[in-house]
Amino acid sequence: SKDGLKVQGWLMKPANFDPSKKYPMVLWIHGGPWSMYSVNWNWAYQNFAANGYAVLWTNPRGSTGYGQDFVNGIQHSYPGKDYDDLMASVDAARDTLHRGLADALIL
C-alpha cells in the first residue's frame, strides 16, 4: 500500500497467456467494508480471463479476516486508505504488467 502496509491480493492471467502480448485488466472490488476475498472459485474472474483479460482482486483496509486493527483502518476515512490500497495494488500489478502481462493503458 501507499504507506507500506502489505495487502493481500491475487492476479489471474488470461487464458492462453502469452508473455509477449499485452492484455487489458479488470480490478474487481468486493463490497463491504465488512467483507473479504479468500481462495475460492469465481465464475466472473474465469469469464474475464477466458475472454482475454487479466483480473486483479485484493483485500484493502476495512476488509475482515486480518484483525480488528485492519478493519478499523478506514474508520473516519471512507473512502481513504482503502482506496489508496486498491490503487497501490493496481500499481503493483502494473509493474508486473510491464513485464508482459497486461497493457497498462487498458486498466
Give short role names for the model-derived ranges.
Residues 1-107:
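Serine-hydrolase catalytic core recognition
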